UniProtKB/Swiss-Prot annotation:
This is NAD kinase. It is found in: Cytoplasm. NAD(+) binds at D78, G79, N151, D152, K162, R179, D181, T192, A193, Y194, A195, L196, S197, Q252. The keyword Cytoplasm applies. It comes from the Bacteria. It catalyses: NAD(+) + ATP = ADP + NADP(+) + H(+). One of its GO terms (molecular function) is NAD binding. Involved in the regulation of the intracellular balance of NAD and NADP, and is a key enzyme in the biosynthesis of NADP. Catalyzes specifically the phosphorylation on 2'-hydroxyl of the adenosine moiety of NAD to yield NADP. Keywords: ATP-binding, Cytoplasm, Kinase, NAD, NADP, Nucleotide-binding, Transferase. It holds the Pfam family NAD_kinase. Belongs to the NAD kinase family. It comes from Coxiella burnetii (strain CbuK_Q154) (Coxiella burnetii (strain Q154)). One of its GO terms (biological process) is NAD metabolic process. GO terms for cellular component: cytoplasm.
Length: 299
């Protein structure tokens, strides 16, 4: 859900950025100085504190940010915001992105336009609620791994480039058996990421839906399918596989799953509260990021 919100200002601002990304330290430093000039309390996440001079500022571990801040500003690209979402969502801390990456579907504000933040801090912004997925890997009765994903839960080949055979169940109903290089289970947020390159549909972020996108399927009739986001997806790895595939959440963690194991995916119970400037427009973002503004040349 996207709504324009006018509410009391944000006064305690936590800053986060990814080390090793060009321009991030400089933007963090400029942002810190700008926030101080606006008489806001600035809190540095531990890694951000290593990148700039924050000797006079409070430094807080990532998992404790909500105790000290009412807004998290992330400097980086979409990958940086994905990482921040994994930290902010369980704490229900709103997130605003400053783009230092390439595409920037999720990070709205350019680093040379930090003054846009002033209106947001004064309570004038758009708040968008985006759901996440929760993935669970089980082998027998044992839970091997569990994690959340803003973009996608992905079944990938193992170390050998071989096809994977697996069964798909939705709400305990058998859907199909597939042989493919893998499967992407994507949220609307992730539909413009890895799933898009795999031929998946673009899902508007306000849709309560997720898409299952097969990767290089063995049969031409195998196509992406869009399902209700309230569904539970079960992927059963065929015992006939002679390799153990991997399961990844947002590309951040990779867990091996043995043949016969199951991957369960469902909507996570906490959403991401993503903050945008009041002039944010989703279709405008698509036009800019996907070069839809370019008109076809006339013959």
């Amino acid at each position: 859900m996207l709504k324009i919100v006018s509410k009391p200002s944000f006064n305690r601002i936590a800053l986060m950025g990814r080390e090793g990304v060009e321009g991030v330290p400089e933007t963090l430093a400029a942002l810190k100085d700008y926030l101080v000039s606006l008489n806001r309390e600035v809190i540095l996440e531990e890694n951000a504190a290593h990148m700039i001079d924050g000797s006079r500022l409070l430094t807080v571990p990532a998992n404790d940010l909500k105790k000290k801040a009412d807004l998290l500003i992330v400097v980086g690209g979409d990958g940086s915001l994905l990482n921040a979402a994994h930290i902010a969502v369980p704490q229900q801390l709103p997130v605003l992105g400053i783009n230092r990456g390439r595409l920037g579907f999720l990070t709205d504000i350019p680093p040379n336009e930090l003054t846009q933040i002033s209106d947001i801090l004064d309570g004038h912004y758009r708040e968008e609620v985006r759901f996440l997925l929760e993935g669970t890997v089980e082998e027998g009765d044992e839970i091997v791994a569990q994690g959340i994903a803003l973009n996608d839960i992905v079944l990938l080949p193992g170390n050998a480039p071989k096809m994977i055979e697996f069964d798909i169940f939705i709400n305990d109903e058998f859907v199909c058996n597939q042989r493919a290089d893998g499967l992407i289970i994507t949220t609307p947020t992730g539909s413009t990421a890895y799933a898009l390159s795999g031929g998946g549909p673009i899902l508007h972020p306000q849709l309560n839906a997720m898409a299952l996108v097969p990767m290089f399927p063995h049969t031409l009739s195998s196509r992406p399918i869009v399902v209700d986001a309230e569904s539970q997806i079960k992927i059963t790895i065929s015992p006939e596989n002679d390799v153990s595939p991997y399961v990844s959440n947002d590309g951040q963690e990779r867990v091996s799953i043995k043949p016969g194991g199951n991957v369960y995916t469902r909507k996570y119970h906490y959403p991401l509260h993503l903050i945008h400037p009041t002039d944010y427009n989703y279709y405008g973002t698509l036009r800019r990021k996907l070069d839809w503004e370019k008109r076809a040349a006339k013959v």
